[in-house]
Each structure stands twice: as C-alpha cells, then as structure tokens.
Amino acid sequence: MESKEISIRSRTPPSKLYSIQSCIGRGNFGDVYKAVDRVTQEIVAIKVVNLEHSDEDIELLAQEIFFLAELKSPLITNYIATMLEDVSMWIVMEYCGGGSCSDLLKRSYVNGLPEEKVSFIIHEVTLGLKYLHEQRKIHRDIKAANILLNEEGMVKLGDFGVSGHIRSTLKRDTFVGTPYWMAPEVVCCEVDGYNEKADIWSLGITTYELLKGLPPLSKYDPMKVMTNLPKRKPPKLQGPFSDAAKDFVAGCLVKTPADRPSAYNLLSFEFVKNITITNLKSDVDLIKQKKVQERYTKVPKYPLQNRLYKNSNTVRGKEFWNFESTRLSTTQISKEELSPITQDSPTSSLNMESPYLLHGQTVTPITNPSSSSFRKCTQPVFELDSGMDIDSGCPNAQAETEIVPLSNHNKKHKKNDIQALKIEKFDYLKNIVSHILNRMYDRARDDETRKYVNEMLKQFIKTEANVPGFNEVFIEEISLRIEAIKKGFV
C-alpha cells in the first residue's frame, strides 16, 4: 500500500518525469497522451484527468486506480503509476502503438473485418475478460474503440476509466457505458444492479460491430436506443457469416443476465476455439502508414500548459477552440459517440452524410484565386461567434500567430472575462484541413467517395508544400466569407 501512496502523491511533478509527445485520444474522463519517460526513455500512455472539470471524487478515483494496479496480464494494458500535478491526475499506462480496433474499421475495413481476424480479436478479448472477472472486476465499456493493439499486433483490453469492482453484493448500480453497447440491465438501472454478465452482452455487440463495421441499432438516436432496448428482442447477426459467428453473438446477446454464458464458457464456442491467425501486425503497420500520410492528430479537450494552446486561469475547458465540436448541440461528445445519420437532408450530398448544413442552406460555388501568391487581407476583421478574431493583416493588427482580444463583441457574450487565446506555430493543414477531410472520410458512404476525399487531402498537402501559407489563407477566406454572409453582405 505504501508504494501506491507514493505513486499517488509523488513530490516530483509528472511533467518533469515524462516528456509529452502528442495527444492520441480524448474522452469524457480526460485526454490521453503519448509520452516518454525522461529516465528510461520508455514510451508510455498518460491519461490526464482534469479534476477541476470532473464530477469524480478524488478518493474514489484513487480507489479505482488501486485495483487497476492489481491487474497483471498480457491481455490487459499494464498500469504503471498515478501522480498529481496542479488540478490534474496523471495515470501512466502501457503504450499500445498499434491503435485500436476502431482504427481498423475506420481506415481499412469500413464494412467489417474478415471473420478470421474477428475470431482472433474476440478470442483474446474473451481471455482478457475471463481474467478480469476472475479478479472480481467489470470492464463496463467493451467496444472496438477500447480494444487496443500493440506494435506487434497483439490485442489488449484498454480504457479502464469506467471500470468497477464487483462488491461483496455482486452488483453495481451506476449508469456507465456507451448506449449502443450497453446491456439491458445497465440501461434499466435495475434494483438488483448488474454484474460481470454486462460485459458479455457488450462483447456480443462488439463482435457484431467488428463483423459488420457498426454496432446494431447505430442508425438510431442513442437516447431512443436506450429507451427501447429493454423492450426489444436481442439483435441478431444476419448476413454472409458463418453459423459459428452467429451462434457466438446469439450466445452473448441473451436478455436475462443469468442465462448468458461466462467468459470461461464462451471460450468453448467454435467461433473462438479454432483461430487461424496469431497477430494483426500487417494491419497495424498499414494503419500507422495511413496515419503518417494523413498527418493524423488529436486535439485535447483540456490542453496541457505550454502546449498548442495557452490560456489564462479564467478560461474554462469548454471555451477552448474545439475542432471536434459540431453546431448540432452545445454538449461536447467524442467522435466515437456520434451516432450515424440515417435520413438524407434536402441539402446533403448524395454520397456524404452531413449534419452541418441548416435547412435551406446551399453550397456556394468554388472561386479561383486571382494569382498563385497571396497578399494580406485588407478588409475589416469579422468577429467569430466562438469569441475569436481572425488576423486581418492590417497594419495595426497583432502578430500572425496571435488571436487578438475582442472589444465590443464581448457584449454579445455572457462572460466578459475571457482573455484571448494565443496559438503558437499553428498548423492549419494539420489541425483544420486534415481534420475536416479525415472526418469526411469517416462519414463517406462508399469507397469511391473516400477515394476522392483522400485525393483532395493529398492535393492540399502538395499545394502547401509548393505554396507555404496556402491553407492558412484558404481557411481565413472561408471564415471571412461566412461572416460576410451572416451580416448580409452577399
């Protein structure tokens, strides 16, 4: 216990022990960074939980971390240490450089993985759950995004941010998880609570997800799914799949928890009994190559100090320029939580699902630049609704890398104490253009559309290399045009 206490209350700030490299993930419980141990040079993953914006009690978080420290299995991401710095808790874990199974679906197998690969993945996950349940612990958030791969293509269960310990009463009564993967008893918040069998239901949904590319009912709104799940019959795996795969999914998706097989019993099912492959290294290598080509990056929900964003103490996390937010809702949700759109908007593309166009809104035609080089914009600055100005390029404007404070525009906002956010060496290609096109790639309905989106990204990269600053001016002109239209200067 003493070593754990030292781990939690280390006097050395974690920022002095680890060198943060990049943000590799974000979720409701914090941001995940790739980092390097300054002493051993070991690459690790660090989940930084912003306690100021978390509803979790620090002692409860500590209890969760203590039982995570007890897990020792090659099928579970290894826990290393936990430290506190300022208002953040740093949870240091083993780094899985191969990404997640969700990455495989998004970048290589949009219509589902081959059955033999799913069989291997689920076999490893089932073994991991068997170990976890034997330790009297529940994962509570099994899905493709939380099944991680290391550099060698081996499977590991990750993201234990919402895991729970099975108490002596063998039940949990907290409402945690992701709607499409939730077991009926979790959605109902039954009086008797739920046990490790909730993970078995989620395992069945995840198997379905890996085979078909999406979880069942994903075309419906998450709240509707939660409302109707207890009343619906269990989903069935239909299509050109083996009887073994269908039997496995059906075995997991039994509504009565007591009738579901345990993880131990699932290992005797034919679907996971006769696996033919031993790793997914070739897929991991391909995904890593694609991420390099796409200049893949994540924008943290709560950026660390001295990184991309610099802010005063008065600026709260929800007021950062969040590139992953949409105009559909004021609630920020992660990319994995976005439900697919099923009905075409009158203004949407035939091949692309778009929740962004408002009713009656149309797409303006593309205009050609007057020359191959760009000059500074000399027209007045249009103030954005986000509370930030775009550099006008006028003589009295501040440096290009700084967003100037607002003056009269503050009257339109409830909070007047928000200071300007400074952006240092901002990469418009990586953080805006590439980010947008990657989202469009993920939302494309067919391979042909994805091919065109990918070609478009290549053109932006090529143009930026030949005409430095192209993407910055491009984004600036779009913003200015939108604001002009809003103000009636059509």
Swiss-Prot record:
Any one annotated GO CC term: prospore membrane
Known EC number: 2.7.11.1
Top-level taxonomic group: Eukaryota
Reactions it catalyzes: L-seryl-[protein] + ATP = O-phospho-L-seryl-[protein] + ADP + H(+); L-threonyl-[protein] + ATP = O-phospho-L-threonyl-[protein] + ADP + H(+)
Subcellular location: Nucleus; Cytoplasm
Molecular function GO terms recorded: ATP binding; protein kinase activity; protein serine kinase activity; protein serine/threonine kinase activity
Catalytic residues (positions): D141
Keywords on record: ATP-binding, Cytoplasm, Kinase, Meiosis, Nucleotide-binding, Nucleus, Serine/threonine-protein kinase, Sporulation, Transferase
EC top class named in words: transferase
InterPro entries: Kinase-like_dom_sf, Prot_kinase_dom, Protein_kinase_ATP_BS, STE20/SPS1-PAK
Binding-site list for ATP: I24, G25, R26, G27, N28, F29, G30, D31, V32, K47
Matches recorded under CDD domains: STKc_MST3_like (cd06609)
Family that this chain belongs to: Belongs to the protein kinase superfamily. STE Ser/Thr protein kinase family. STE20 subfamily.
Protein name: Sporulation-specific protein 1
Annotated organism of origin: Saccharomyces cerevisiae (strain ATCC 204508 / S288c)
Lineage of the species this protein comes from: Eukaryota, Fungi, Dikarya, Ascomycota, Saccharomycotina
